[in-house]
Design a protein with these regions (language model features):
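Ligand-binding cleft/hinge of the Venus flytrap
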Residues: 1-17, 45-50
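Short coil/loop linkers at secondary-structure junctions
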Residues: 8-9, 52, 123-127, 167-168, ...
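A short, structure-level motif marking secondary-structure boundaries and short turns
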Residues: 9-10, 27-29, 141-144
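Residue-level marker of alpha-helix boundaries and capping positions
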Residues: 14-15, 33-34, 148
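Pocket-lining segment of extracytoplasmic ligand-binding domains
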Residues: 23-121
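Secondary-structure end/capping motifs
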Residues: 84-167
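Conserved C-terminal helix/tail region of periplasmic/extracytoplasmic solute-binding proteins
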Residues: 155-193
Length: 193
């Protein structure tokens, strides 16, 4: 999408999967790739080690608005509609846990969150705990406190997919997602008015 938006053709670049974390760091250090797309804490590790810098921010609301035209929901509970309809109790339990997690993230500091994660996740060969906390604090805004689909999210995703050539037929966005389970989870958890 970003290439198409900048009028680059697929003949002008190629994609290569190198993973995230230490494998992306190594790929950049050894010239296997010259540009990468990743998330925190890899971004902070790359910047701190002066291996790379953030050219495009897609992790914040402002960055998504600037580069994608609006909110771009990327973390979700994804399942086939037939399975969802046949397993509503299970789906509700998963969404309840996700909403409780989003609320926890919104109401706790990055340091509090890091204290409850596995030690080797927040402090390892790639990042220190302090760097992890700093990165999480910087990017906490990408986690929506109520877990609801952002109002313009589906439209943004569709526009991106169309420009990237992934969607060529009409799409009824109302059939692609539901907030029903999220609304119920917020009520159950006591987060809804």
């Amino acid at each position: 999408y970003l290439a198409a938006k900048s009028s680059l053709t697929q003949a002008q670049f190629h994609r290569q999967g190198v993973g995230a974390g230490s494998t992306l760091v190594a790929a950049l250090q050894h010239g296997t790739v010259v540009c990468g797309m990743t998330t925190q804490p890899t971004v902070s590790a790359l910047e701190t080690q002066k291996i790379a810098y953030s050219a495009i921010d897609l992790a914040t609301t402002d960055g998504a608005d600037k580069w994608l035209g609006g909110a771009f929901p990327s973390a979700a509970v994804l399942a086939n509609a037939d399975w969802v309809n046949a397993n509503k109790d299970t789906v509700q339990k998963v969404v309840d846990a996700l909403v409780a997690t989003m609320h926890y993230i919104a109401t706790h500091s990055a340091a509090d969150i890091a204290d409850h994660l596995p030690p080797n996740f927040v402090s390892n060969g790639l990042v220190t705990k302090d760097l992890y906390v700093k990165a999480l604090d910087q990017d906490k805004g990408q986690f929506l406190p109520d877990g609801m689909m952002p109002a313009n999210g589906p439209d943004t995703v569709l526009a991106v997919e169309k420009l990237a050539g992934k969607v060529t037929a009409p799409v009824d966005l109302t059939k692609t997602y539901t907030n029903d389970f999220v609304v119920a989870a917020n009520k159950l958890e006591g987060f809804a008015q």
